[in-house]
């Protein structure tokens, strides 16, 4: 949406260079429907994750701390979805005022950064736990995990400040509608470029490289261990799970990141073709649905890699209450993979033990 400023009358009045871009009847039906589905599935799934990890698993391991915070971040975002569903159903006419415009926009930005940072830390934690379990034991403590999560929430809040500052309600004169949008003055190109690059680099590229590196090193270490044990089927399982984790993250976010970059070019006037603007504005809410729906499934996806999580999750669905006493498991692992190599790979003759459990 390319916007030009016109006047100031309480709510700032602007002109839309491409007033029909992204405004299609099927979008006004499809996107609110998808938002509603994401809201129901996400609230239900992430609430169950919080209950299972906190009340059943007693929040005893580093991985469980990261997953709990991931679910909480998703819940914060999901609470804003009804607002965006109504906004889209009303054909991009914002009825909620300027304050809720800022809060709802910050909620989207906050979830992006918090979720990506938490997934990145989770991948680093898995690398340390699986490849260097002895060396990292003193660093991978509950206190360190909780402090890390506090820092992540603060960083995500800081990264969301531009949405609070620069997202506002505007009245578009040539469409006679009130919108909640970013609006950049034509002479100020630094801000949109900075925000776009921050979202692309800090919110995707840098975390993806860390996640890719961490799980590649995990796979290499486990592959070496399983070659010693001559356990090829298990090695194939490892590869499939790790590939699923990396590809799940990449394909969830890459469409949104690409169209975010194109949107910045439109805002700057680098792209002036209204046909391209229409494609971008039409695709943007669809990429948001893809990214955030997968985001909201992440706690379930990672949790179900663990046998104990699945066990307690099914107990919860059957209304079996958690035991009063916490379990005494000392495991600090996260998935159905069944070997945790020590720093000395030659000591892998014993029977495998689970290494991706959130126990």
From Swiss-Prot:
Glycosylation sites: 4, 176, 188
Record bears the keyword Nucleus: no
Main location: membrane
UniProt KW keywords: Cell membrane, Disulfide bond, G-protein coupled receptor, Glycoprotein, Lipoprotein, Membrane, Palmitate, Phosphoprotein, Receptor, Transducer, Transmembrane, Transmembrane helix
Pfam families to which the protein is assigned, alphabetical: 7tm_1
Gene3D superfamilies linked: Rhodopsin 7-helix transmembrane proteins (1.20.1070.10)
The name this protein goes by in its record: Type-1 angiotensin II receptor
Source organism per UniProt: Meriones unguiculatus (Mongolian jird)
Taxonomic lineage: Eukaryota, Metazoa, Chordata, Craniata, Vertebrata
């Amino acid at each position: 949406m390319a916007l030009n400023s016109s006047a100031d009358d309480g709510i700032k009045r602007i002109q839309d260079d491409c007033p029909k871009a992204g405004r299609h009847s099927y979008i006004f039906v499809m996107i609110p429907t998808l938002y509603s589905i994401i809201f129901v599935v996400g609230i239900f799934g992430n609430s169950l994750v919080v209950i299972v990890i906190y009340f059943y698993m007693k929040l005893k391991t580093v991985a469980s701390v990261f997953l709990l915070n991931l679910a909480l971040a998703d819940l914060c975002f999901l609470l804003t979805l009804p607002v965006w569903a109504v906004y889209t159903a009303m054909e991009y006419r914002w009825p909620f005022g300027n304050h809720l415009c800022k809060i709802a926009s910050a909620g989207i930005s906050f979830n992006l950064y918090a979720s990506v940072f938490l997934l990145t830390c989770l991948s680093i934690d898995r690398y340390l736990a699986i490849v260097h379990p002895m060396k990292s034991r003193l660093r991978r403590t509950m206190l360190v995990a909780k402090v890390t999560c506090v820092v992540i929430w603060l960083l995500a809040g800081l990264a969301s400040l531009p949405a609070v500052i620069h997202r506002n309600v505007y009245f578009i004169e040539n469409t006679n509608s009130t919108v909640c949008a970013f609006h950049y003055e034509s002479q100020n190109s630094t801000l949109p470029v900075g925000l776009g690059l921050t979202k692309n680099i800090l919110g995707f590229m840098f975390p993806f490289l860390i996640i890719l590196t961490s799980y590649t090193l995990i796979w290499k270490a486990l592959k070496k261990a399983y070659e010693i044990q001559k356990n090829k089927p298990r090695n194939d399982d490892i590869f499939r799970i790790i590939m699923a984790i990396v590809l799940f993250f990449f394909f969830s976010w890459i469409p949104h990141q690409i169209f975010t970059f194109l949107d910045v070019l439109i805002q700057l006037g680098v792209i002036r073709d209204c046909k391209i603007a229409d494609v971008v504005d039409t695709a943007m809410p669809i990429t948001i649905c893809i990214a955030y729906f997968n985001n909201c499934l992440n706690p379930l996806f990672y949790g179900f890699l663990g046998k104990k999580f699945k066990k307690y999750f099914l107990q919860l669905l059957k209304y079996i209450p958690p035991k009063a006493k916490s379990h005494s498991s000392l495991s600090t692992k996260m998935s159905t993979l069944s070997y945790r190599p020590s720093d000395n790979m030659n000591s892998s003759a014993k029977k495998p033990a689970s290494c991706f459990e959130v126990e």
